[in-house]
Amino acid sequence: MAKYIMAFDQGTTSSRAIIFDHSGKIVASQNQEFKQIYPKAGWVEHDPMEIWGTQIGVAKGVIEKAGINPEDIAAIGITNQRETTVVWDKNTGKPIYNAIVWQCRRTAPICDELKNKGFDKKIREKTGLVVDAYFSGTKIKWILDNVEGAREKAEKGELLFGNIDTWLIWNLTRGKVHVTDYSNASRTMLFNIHELKWDKEILEELNVPEQMLPEVKPSSYVYGYTDKSIFGVEIPIAGDAGDQQAALFGQACFKPGMAKNTYGTGCFMLMNTGEKAVPSNTGLLTTIAWGIDGKVEYALEGSIFIAGAAIQWLRDELRIIDNSPQSEEYALKVEDTNGVYVVPAFVGLGAPYWDMYARGTIVGLTRGAKREHIIRATLESIAYQTRDVLEAMQEDSGIKLQALKIDGGASANNFLMQFQSDILGVPVDRPQVIETTALGASYLAGLAVGFWNSKEEIEKNWNVDKHFEPAMDNEKREKLYKGWKKAVERAMKWAEE
């Protein structure tokens, strides 16, 4: 009996492979960063061949590192940076353009056009998403409109579209399988989340041929097998979910009202709403959490575009820290931010503001403002943005959050997590395994092949590593938060022509 599950965690800045055992513990992990391409201001791309190369490289590397054989792997689960768009030639297998990354703002004018026509209401109702350059639909349109010969090839059925999950599965099966799961499909802005199919009216409006699109399957399902030439054996590819939905699953947030926040490049908060798609009146997204056991479950999501990336900015651009963990050390050297607020709206603001033209802002500077204050204010901005999202979620769902489960790289920052608990006024729980994105993909894959039998079995694997209790009084909490709201106002609409 195969003893392990392998997860591919293909992220925005690195490709990672992790091997898990039956108790959900990490046996071995390997990751490799790849190149970020910035052709123009606000444009972000990746090379899909480099993504495939790094992903397969770490997969082979981690098998060796774990000292196991490929036949010891019961299944592969895939989780991915969502919305990032690849269009490739189905005969040559070569991309016709770089992958357009979720952070890329180049399609903002297309989005403005849709809004001016009033088509955004229709998109909101059908897909649960707001019209934004973030999602795949307008990115596909851009490629078809701007790459020479692309539209003709697409009409002839020679081109395929996929998000990163689809691109990896297509390559793993050597072109045999062109598939995605419900969670990833729900991020394209082309998928009707109520009827569970590609929406013809939206496809027509964006002029995207349906034949380019992958088949949509449950998130826990045997999609196909890896080609023998890759690992020497055929391994079932049995789990697929977008990174945030996978993290919700990995955190065992199986009941309505359970929520998690992932602190990665961006911050993503999801609340399970069960079999009901809850529409949002506060600018959150209604999205598919996963499809499993013959049914689909939904979630409310608030996306914060810049979280960990703000700490990278302190390190790489401002050069006021040498590494990310140092941010905690410096933040603790001062009592507070001395009235400084940083609004890291480098690529606009996500939920609940959705302002594509907001830009990064530092306010409240005085002669006494030091490096430590700016570092601390940058960390605090992550917690404030999370509170913005949580308030919107509670309003939409009518559910008051009891505790927040956390994961992702920056959740290891104890200063930030304590401040998060303080500013929310609810307990925050960090699990022992913070690689919950990869863990969720593993669980989905393992359930499909009988490696695990039920969600209940998985739930028993979840254990708390550190519990944070709010230690701030309400008056101080509200005063600080009011200052944040004022700072956000200053950042909004900055780049409008």
From Swiss-Prot:
Keywords: ATP-binding, Glycerol metabolism, Kinase, Nucleotide-binding, Transferase. ADP binds at residues 12, 16, 265, 308, 409, 413. Sn-glycerol 3-phosphate binds at residues 12, 82-83, 134, 243. GO terms for molecular function: ATP binding; glycerol kinase activity. The keyword Lipid biosynthesis does not apply. Belongs to the FGGY kinase family. This is Glycerol kinase. It comes from Thermoanaerobacter sp. (strain X514).
